[in-house]
Amino acid sequence: MAGAGGGGNDVQWCFSQVKGAIDDDVAEADIISTVEFNHSGELLATGDKGGRVVIFQQELESKNQPQCRGEYNVYSTFQSHEPEFDYLKSLEIEEKINKIRWLPQKNAAQFLLSTNDKTIKLWKISERDKRPEGYNLKEEDGRYRDPTTVTTLRVPVFQPMDLMVEASPRRVFANAHTYHINSISVNSDCETYLSADDLRINLWNLEITDRSFNIVDIKPVNMEELTEVITAAEFHPNQCNTFVYSSSKGTIRLCDMRASALCDQHSKLFEEPEDPSNRSFFSEIISSISDVKFSHSGRYMMTRDYLSVKIWDLNMESRPVETYQVHEYLRSKLCSLYENDCIFDKFECCWNGNDSVVMTGSYNNFFRMFDRGYRQDVTLEASRESSKPRSVLKPRKVCTGGKRKKDEISVDSLDFNKKILHTAWHPQDNIIAVATTNNLYIFQDKL
Amino acid sequence: MSSENLSDTQMEYEDEKQDSQEKNANLVKGEEVKLKAKYPGLGQKPGGSDFLMKRLQKGQKYFDSGDYNMAKAKMKNKQLPVAGPDKNLVTGDHIPTPQDLPQRRSSLVTSKLAG
């Protein structure tokens, strides 16, 4: 059961595993673009810029080492999407996997949705551990036998074989998005899911690929009047009629599909009023929400904008109930962050299993955890230096003033190319997956 | 809906918060001044249309069938089409064939995470 969380109260985070190449020369295809645990936490999926999906499976805890949680090892890997070129629109379609979402498990097989900018695919991952042997007309290697040599008949039987994990695309949901898909979210009814692009949100049935319903459309009649785009969307965890979507202007709209077929009219609008004296050129850019996630309870939702994480109570639209500063020291760097485009980086955020702690990434391969109950926060680093097995991670600190204490790092020394955009928290245990540019780190709490 | 009765300590906290907010606002305004000094032509509506348009048009490349056919004709004299050093240049010889347009081929190599 997840403890009080990462605030440093009683949880100590230890290095567990790191996946990926060590060398500094990162091929673009190896850039990790999404990380997601399945509903039981047994499987961990990653997607990359090369359109590939790698799934890790947690090993069962060994009897010899009851104090250790199982390690995650490769279970399956496949090419989900390929690069395409739309000749009619002169558009290059990247194969980068933007999001992976698991379906709740219903039978022996596992299902996940993976999407690039334009196409969503439903993948089935199944195990095969037996195969039929003893055919009458075929040899074991598949060659056909000469029928004249068959003198007796036998019934083929299933024999055990080495485990084989197969991934096959079961559905392809294509041609429904003019703009770039940023989110997919499976509904709690397990029958439908939504996909959101910059201007529209569509509702799909998992069984039907040739039709989808448009439920949100914010495209203005005159594109010159465009002032905001959709940045993320998610279904409520247990109310199948409710979903939210966030915008580049820092607002979140909650919609109820029972109200009307087209949910352009929101049911609730969550927006924190800004002090007009604080307004600057950067205001809108840094208020753009890069991720929105409901709490497991469904009572709260969390949003991530460039500098902070906000927790909203669904019952209160006027302002967030909690605000956590992720890297406030970047305010004095906004000019250069705009010039090098870092100000447009889209950080994600996640909840722990019991909604007591939230986590998000930052620069210099730092990531932050905020314990809501104990009001504590901690900065940790994902690096090869602190990757000795079971070594406890040391909290990091960025110094903003003149005097730099020992072990602190100054703002000017931060490496803005080392960004942690994607993190995931195991649904029950204190196990986290943190993606640096091309490596996947797995940390666990000290047992 | 929320109650506005603040205790003394809460008032102090609010004051402090306001101070730090002012400080933050000044920091940010300072950055804005720096940016405007570097780029005097920066648009009136920074978060607005231009910017969003750029975002919506990500991935746009221009294919000209005339260029394509011309280059195809030239290709007969060449061994292999040579993609220009600047792959974003879209005129003339720089887009010889559709095969070059998807600049990246799909990864034939297994992900290093699975290695």
Curated annotation (Swiss-Prot), chain B:
GO BP annotations listed: cell division; G2/M transition of mitotic cell cycle; mitotic cell cycle
InterPro entries per the UniProt record, alphabetical: Endosulphine
Region described as Disordered: spans on this chain: 1-27, 77-115
Signal sequence annotation: none
GO molecular function: phosphatase inhibitor activity; protein phosphatase 2A binding; protein phosphatase inhibitor activity; protein phosphatase regulator activity
GO cellular component labels: cytoplasm
Primary location group: cytoplasm
Phosphoserine modified-residue sites: S65
Keyword tags: Cell cycle, Cell division, Cytoplasm, Mitosis, Phosphoprotein, Protein phosphatase inhibitor
Localization in the cell: Cytoplasm
Biased amino acid composition, Polar residues: 1-10, 104-115
Domain of life of the organism encoding this protein: Eukaryota
Modification note: Phosphorylation at Ser-65 by gwl during mitosis is essential for interaction with ppp2r2d (PR55-delta) and subsequent inactivation of PP2A.
Keyword Lyase tagged: no
PANTHER family hit by this protein: ALPHA-ENDOSULFINE, ENDOSULFINE
Function field: Protein phosphatase inhibitor that specifically inhibits protein phosphatase 2A (PP2A) during mitosis.
Recorded family membership: Belongs to the endosulfine family.
Protein name: Alpha-endosulfine
Lineage of origin: Eukaryota, Metazoa, Chordata, Craniata, Vertebrata
Encoding gene, per UniProt annotation: ensa
